[in-house]
């Protein structure tokens, strides 16, 4: 399902964003 793929990408992007904030 395309919607599920988009949701997964957003979730991964959020995890990377949180990791960047923590590393800074």
Curated annotation (Swiss-Prot):
Top-level division of the source organism's lineage: Eukaryota
Protein name: Unknown protein 6
Provenance organism: Lonomia obliqua
